[in-house]
């Protein structure tokens, strides 16, 4: 049996929105391209599977669970359970939440496994699958059936079957045929499961849940044997356990009180027991120690999964938040230990089918042996008839006959053993009809063979010998070898199948790697292509930049020369009176400087594309207007016209502006500066604004993409809910249509019956009138008789009696007729009621169809919305890619633009003081904003540092408490070791003294007399015994000191747990210290920068304004900081409220969908019950038709009376069986005590009972009776009688079954409510039967006295449900009723009904 380790997977959930808002750090990370997890700084763990925060449900299922589903179909038991702290994603991973409102991509392990299982079942048509489902909850260490809530917790018990597998007795197992039924049962169980709300989780599981799928496979063996017999089918039984554990909780974090606190205690105790089991199984040093499975019920249920015969996968769910560091570390440690657990999975073949196959093969061999023996007998008879003179041949044949007779006797013994085994198997194991039929045929065949053998032996006088050729022996040997070869071949086939599976897995992995390589190659080609295009564009842009720089230098030279000419004219310069032409001010002003022969310059600076958003244009225009306002304030007016047209219109405007620049000169005020220089300034500003606009575009597109993705998820969820509701509606519509058909059928039957009744009503009315007339006539005659004076008084009394009898009969007849008339009216109204119900059902079906049409319409609309959203998302993704590519190119040009800005600034410094002043103002504003942000960031870091310090203090206090407890245990260990050292010292000194005394005694023995020698030898023996005991003690003490086992195992375990907890807390403290140090460093640097910045602020403010303005500005600065901080906190609070609102909305939506689901389920159940009711009504109407409508109410009454009588009889039989068992136990105990001698009680090795054995025998006798044997059907009793007639040797085990089956006792005793017999002869026969049965019982009890020496007695226990507690008053009444004489008891109703039949036969 091959051992395999438990597979362990770790799944790290992403940070929650609440954790991200509070800036929780990520302390658990996945090492890329490996199956390793790192927690904190340097703690690395390796597992079988590792899933990061971006892993999907499909990935988890395909990697971990799919192989388990394949193993389940192969016949192995499988288990998957999720382990981790509360709120780490266990229920989400397993899939135990509300399934109807979950989209396809977010479904957990259980729904996917259910689909996979039924898909595999559909792929194997040659195998009959029987699927059962159970759902158990462990709540407060009590078992609870989630599929049958009415089942009491006391009726559910954990037991072990004959193979050692853990089973739950009393749990409901539902047969299912499809995945939809399983999903509905799972949904029903999830709705009944205990969940609650804590501070860490809105939907916290308050119990452990185990969802089990049991599959029984029956392989159809279509190959027949050579002689035409069929082998029994092959049975395989396997189970899949899906375990959703409740998370470990800390009261300080969850804030549980009251009932939630009690639940937390039970949850933590169960998880502690599970952790102890994992530690015991995973620690190689503790393999020989006891495994504490019985410490909790969840560990008992997981016994097969941890160290048993199942294939197990443990999924450890971990929170990455730094606030849960210690919990995550402990979970990873337990998961690492679980990797050392090894299971021994086996295929679960049904033992009954294997036994039947073996017996059928043995029967086949015996049949062949009998045929060969019969052939040998015929040959020997032929030889005897021929009278061959060869005496040597006769002697050899006689020897062969003797040998064959010995073999025949052996075969007969085998047949008898097989026969008794089959009879026992038939009584103990429930067989189906096919197997029972086979057994009965085999019984008949054995009986026929025995008869044929007897007749053949009688025919030849019982002296004929058997002969068999040597070929038969060789055939049997060859068949045995063939059987061995078949077993070896089957084992080889299993190995080959395993190898084939491994080869398939390797092929799949190779294919996956090839596909990944292809994908990487394609992505590499695309990246190379993009890189080549980018290089080409960069080269083109570099060339353009060089050309533009050359032309810009030329243009600057021409501008400076023209400016000198204009400024040097003085008063001769003419100032035009009209307004100058305006220059368009757009995003790229570099084009509006005329370049005569460069049309390719548009490739560098192009206008934004047509698909840019309007809001981006609006923002751009507002910023441009703000720039214009600043320029007008400085008396440098530059009016610009904005073009909102398309790209063509913009290009036309650019060409026109270029011609204006060529044809006209710029007209300025006398003290103004040249406007072309200002154009270069605006050009730089617009280039910067372009980059900002591109970033804004990307942010807007990403936000819109997130919104569209959210809408897409909502539409998918609505689609799944609508599809689920449509499926349920179709099921309900179909069921209601079937119910309508049943109602129509019932209505037709009721109409036909009502027609019959209408005829009978008229007849009954006629009979009623006639009866009334007869009644009136009899009353008149009675009055006449009373008025007449008859001489004979006796005659008068006789006539009065006769008339009164007639009157009573007539009244009774009238009452019966009136009742029949009422019943006929009710039956006639039945068809009308059915028509009404059918109309109501048709209306509900129409309403459901209308709902279905609406849902279909909604589905179409949602599909269209989904397609539109997909298109929008693809378009936004394409835009983002293009903008990112464009911004990447522009970022490559930033150094050139910065160089140009530097040149422009150097050129403008001398003459443009006002522009410098504006730039200084902007810089000061930016600087103030940066200072405010620095202060805010510093305060936020301070708050985070304070929170980390508080957490570290809590961890340190916890560590100190653990250290105190550890120091207490270590001191105890030290004191114990010191005590052991002193003990060992005392023992050694005492041993030295004893050795001295022994040496002295030995010297005295040599010199003393005989009497003294005996005394001294006795003293020496005493001293030697004391020495041996002291040596043993010293050896034990030395062993304890050597191994360090000073404390008890519990204290050692507690010390081990404390060391682990301290280690985890030290790691958490180390992690906290590291984060605190980093924060302190950043805070010191920020403090230094802030102090320097504050000094700069004060200096600049002192230079700009007086002291009062400076103080006001400083106060304003603090006020702004406080307001920004309050704004941040309010924003954080608003985000939390939004998240809570979203959670509440999701909860409301889930509850509404669950309510709709439950309504449809209730409607479905109600429809099913109505359908069953209508079928029963049809059966009654059919029965009524067969009886022609007479006595229907009488049959109802008789049935009800019979049911009541049977219930009374059942109660009586239970009571009498208990009394008989008690009496039987007492009588058997007395008989055993009388027959067994006292000397026999002390013998232990001869198979005779000890006193303890007597007690055990009485206990076995207590449970020996089997009431089920009294409830056998007639066919089974015939089989038992035929089987018992075939037996040649008495079976001692059957004696126990014969004891409770004492028909005279039960036939003589009857319940008090039984019918009294009218004949006295019957009572006499009953008395005689009772005396016979009493004598028979005493003889049987004497036989039972010797049963104590029999072996192999199998006690059969009654079910606990058959026992109930009775009151003292009821007990006294029963004892008083038992004290009554047996002859006065009434006969049982069943026996009364049987006696006339027995008399007839």
Curated annotation (Swiss-Prot):
Region (Disordered): 643-662, 1259-1332
Phosphoserine modification, residue list: 643, 646, 672, 675, 704, 999, 1367, 1389
One Pfam family matching this protein: Kinesin
Compositionally biased spans, kind Basic and acidic residues: 1259-1280
Phylogenetic placement of the source organism: Eukaryota, Metazoa, Chordata, Craniata, Vertebrata
Tissue specificity annotation: Testis, pancreatic islet, germ cell tumors and Jurkat T-cells.
MF-aspect GO terms: ATP binding; ATP hydrolysis activity; microtubule binding; microtubule motor activity
Keyword Coiled coil: yes
Organism, as annotated: Homo sapiens
Annotated keywords: ATP-binding, Cell projection, Cilium, Cilium biogenesis/degradation, Coiled coil, Cytoplasm, Cytoskeleton, Microtubule, Motor protein, Nucleotide-binding, Phosphoprotein
Name this polypeptide is given: Kinesin-like protein KIF27
């Amino acid at each position: 049996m091959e051992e395999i380790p438990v597979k362990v997977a770790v799944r790290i959930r992403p940070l929650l929105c609440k954790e991200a808002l509070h800036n929780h750090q990520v302390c658990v990370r996945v090492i890329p391209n490996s199956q390793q997890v790192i927690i904190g700084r340097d703690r690395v763990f390796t597992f079988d599977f590792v899933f990061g925060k971006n892993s999907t449900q499909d990935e988890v299922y395909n990697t971990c669970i799919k192989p388990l589903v394949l193993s389940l179909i192969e016949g192995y038991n499988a288990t998957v359970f999720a382990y981790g702290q509360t709120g780490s994603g266990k229920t989400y991973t397993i899939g135990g939440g509300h399934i109807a409102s979950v989209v396809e991509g977010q479904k957990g392990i259980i729904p996917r496994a259910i689909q996979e299982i039924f898909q595999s079942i559909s792929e194997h048509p040659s195998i009959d699958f029987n699927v059962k489902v159970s759902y158990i909850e462990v709540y407060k260490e009590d078992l609870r059936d989630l599929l049958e809530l009415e089942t009491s917790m006391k009726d559910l018990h954990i037991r072990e079957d004959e193979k050692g597998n853990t089973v739950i007795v009393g749990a409901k197992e539902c047969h299912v045929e499809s995945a939809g039924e399983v999903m509905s049962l799972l949904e029903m169980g999830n709705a009944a499961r205990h969940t609650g709300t804590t501070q860490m989780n809105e939907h916290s599981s308050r119990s452990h849940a185990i969802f089990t799928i049991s599959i029984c496979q029956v392989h159809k063996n279509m190959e027949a044997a050579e002689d035409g017999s069929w082998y029994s089918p092959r049975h395989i039984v396997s189970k899949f356990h899906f375990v959703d554990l409740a998370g470990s909780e800390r009261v300080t974090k969850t804030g549980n009180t009251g009932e939630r606190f009690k639940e937390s205690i039970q949850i933590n105790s169960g998880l502690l027991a599970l952790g102890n089991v994992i530690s015991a199984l995973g620690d190689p040093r503790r393999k020989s120690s006891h495994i504490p499975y019985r410490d909790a019920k969840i560990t008992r249920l997981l016994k097969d999964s941890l160290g048993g015969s199942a294939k197990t996968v443990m999924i450890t769910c971990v929170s990455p938040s730094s606030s849960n560091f210690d919990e995550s570390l402990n979970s990873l440690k337990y998961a690492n230990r679980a990797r050392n657990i090894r299971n021994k999975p086996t295929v679960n073949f049904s033992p009954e089918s294997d036994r039947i196959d073996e017996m059928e093969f043995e029967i086949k061999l015996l049949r062949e042996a009998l045929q060969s023996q019969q052939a040998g007998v015929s040959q020997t008879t032929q030889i005897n008839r021929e009278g061959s003179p060869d005496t040597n041949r006769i002697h050899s044949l006689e020897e062969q006959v003797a040998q064959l007779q010995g073999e025949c006797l052996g075969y007969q013994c085998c047949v008898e053993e097989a026969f008794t085994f089959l009879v026992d198997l038939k009584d103990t194991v429930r067989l189906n009809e096919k197997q029972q039929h086979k057994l009965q045929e085999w019984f008949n065949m054995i009986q026929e063979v025995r008869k044929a053998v007897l007749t053949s032996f009688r025919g030849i006088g019982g002296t004929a010998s058997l002969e068999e050729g040597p070929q038969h022996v060789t055939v049997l040997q060859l068949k045995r070898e063939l059987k061995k070869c078949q077993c070896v071949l089957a084992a080889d086939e299993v190995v080959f199948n395993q190898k084939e599976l491994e080869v398939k897995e390797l092929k799949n992995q190779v294919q996956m790697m090839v596909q990944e390589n292809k994908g990487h190659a394609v992505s590499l080609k695309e990246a190379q292509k993009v890189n080549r295009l980018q290089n080409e564009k960069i080269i083109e842009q570099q060339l353009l930049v060089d050309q533009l720089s050359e032309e810009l230098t030329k243009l600057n030279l021409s501008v400076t020369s023209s400016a000198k000419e204009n400024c040097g004219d003085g008063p001769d310069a003419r100032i035009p009176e009209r307004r100058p032409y305006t220059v368009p001010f757009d995003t790229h002003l570099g084009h509006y400087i005329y370049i005569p022969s460069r049309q390719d310059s548009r490739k560098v600076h192009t206008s934004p594309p047509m698909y840019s958003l309007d809001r981006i244009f609006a923002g751009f225009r507002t910023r441009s207007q703000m720039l214009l306002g600043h320029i007008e304030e400085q008396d440098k007016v530059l009016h610009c016209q904005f073009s909102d047209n398309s790209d063509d219109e913009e290009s036309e405007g650019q060409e026109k502006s270029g011609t204006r620049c060529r044809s006209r000169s710029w007209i300025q005020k006398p003290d103004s500066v040249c406007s072309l220089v200002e154009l270069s300034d605006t050009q730089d500003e617009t280039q910067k604004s372009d980059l900002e606009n591109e970033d804004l575009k990307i942010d807007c597109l990403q936000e819109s993409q997130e919104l569209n993705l959210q809408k897409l998820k909502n539409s998918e969820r609505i689609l799944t809910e609508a599809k689920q509701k449509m499926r349920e509606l179709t099921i309900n519509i179909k069921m209601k249509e079937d119910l309508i058909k049943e109602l129509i059928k019932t209505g037709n039957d009721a109409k036909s019956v009502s027609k019959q009744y209408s005829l009978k009503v008229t007849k009954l009315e006629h009979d009623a009138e006639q009866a009334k007339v007869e009644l009136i006539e009899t009353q008149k005659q009675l009055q006449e008789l009373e008025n007449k004076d008859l001489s004979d008084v006796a005659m008068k009394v006789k006539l009065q009696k006769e008339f009164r009898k007639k009157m009573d009969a007539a009244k009774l007849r009238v009452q019966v007729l009136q009742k029949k008339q009422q019943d006929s009216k009710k039956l006639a109204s039945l068809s009308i009621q059915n028509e009404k119900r059918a109309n109501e059902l048709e209306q509900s079906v129409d309403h459901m169809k209308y709902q279905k049409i609406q849902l279909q319409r909604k589905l179409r609309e949602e599909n269209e919305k989904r397609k539109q959203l997909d298109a929008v998302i693809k378009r936004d993704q394409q835009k983002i890619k293009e903008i990112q590519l464009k911004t990447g190119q522009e970022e490559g040009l930033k150094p050139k633009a910065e160089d140009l800005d530097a040149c422009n600034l150097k050129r403008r410094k001398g003459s443009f003081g006002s522009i410098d002043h504006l730039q200084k103002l902007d810089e000061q504003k930016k600087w103030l904003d940066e200072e405010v942000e620095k202060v805010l960031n510093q305060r936020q870091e301070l708050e985070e540092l304070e929170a980390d310090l508080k957490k570290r203090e809590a961890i340190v206090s916890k560590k100190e408490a653990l250290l105190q407890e550890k120091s207490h245990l270590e001191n105890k260990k030290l004191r114990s070791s010191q005590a052991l050292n002193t003990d060992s010292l005392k023992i050694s000194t005492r041993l030295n003294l004893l050795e001295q005394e022994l040496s002295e005694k030995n010297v005295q023995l040599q010199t003393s007399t005989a009497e003294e020698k005996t005394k001294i030898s006795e003293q020496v023996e005493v001293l030697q015994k004391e020495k041996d005991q002291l040596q043993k003690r010293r050896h034990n003490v030395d062993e304890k000191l050597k191994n360090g086992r000073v404390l008890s195992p519990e204290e050692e375990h507690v010390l081990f747990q404390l060391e682990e907890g301290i280690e985890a807390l030290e790691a958490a403290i180390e992690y906290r210290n590291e984060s605190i140090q980093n924060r302190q460093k950043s805070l010191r640097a920020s403090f230094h920068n802030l102090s320097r910045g504050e000094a700069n602020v004060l200096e600049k403010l002192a230079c700009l304004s007086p002291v009062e303005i400076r103080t006001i500005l400083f106060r304003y600065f603090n006020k702004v900081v406080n307001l920004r901080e309050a704004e941040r906190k309010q924003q954080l609070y608003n985000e939390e409220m939004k998240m809570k609102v979203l959670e509440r909305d999701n909860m409301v939506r889930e509850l509404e969908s669950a309510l709709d689901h439950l309504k449809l389920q209730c409607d479905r159940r109600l429809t099913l019950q109505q359908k069953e009711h209508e079928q029963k009504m049809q059966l009654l109407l059919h029965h009524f038709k067969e009886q022609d409508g007479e006595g229907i109410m009488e049959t109802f009454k008789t049935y009800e009376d019979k049911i009541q009588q049977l219930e009374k009889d059942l109660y009586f039989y239970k009571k009498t069986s208990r009394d008989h068992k008690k009496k039987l136990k007492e009588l058997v105990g007395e008989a055993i005590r009388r027959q067994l001698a006292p000397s026999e009680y002390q013998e232990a090795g001869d198979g005779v009972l000890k006193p303890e054995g007597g007690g055990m025998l009485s206990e076995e006798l207590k449970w020996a009776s089997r009431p089920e044997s009294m409830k056998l059907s007639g066919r089974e009793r015939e089989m038992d009688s035929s089987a018992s007639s075939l037996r040649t040797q008495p079976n001692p085990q059957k004696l126990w079954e014969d004891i409770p089956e004492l028909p005279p006792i039960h036939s003589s005793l009857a319940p008090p409510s039984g019918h009294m017999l009218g004949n006295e002869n019957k009572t006499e026969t009953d008395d005689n039967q009772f005396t016979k049965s009493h004598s028979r019982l005493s003889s049987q009890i004497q036989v039972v006295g010797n049963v104590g020496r029999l072996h192999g007695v199998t006690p059969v226990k009654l079910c606990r449900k058959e026992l109930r507690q009775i009151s003292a008053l009821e007990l006294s009444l029963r004892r008083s009723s038992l004290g009554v004489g047996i002859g006065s008891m009434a006969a049982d109703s069943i026996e009364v009904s049987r006696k006339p039949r027995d008399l007839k036969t």
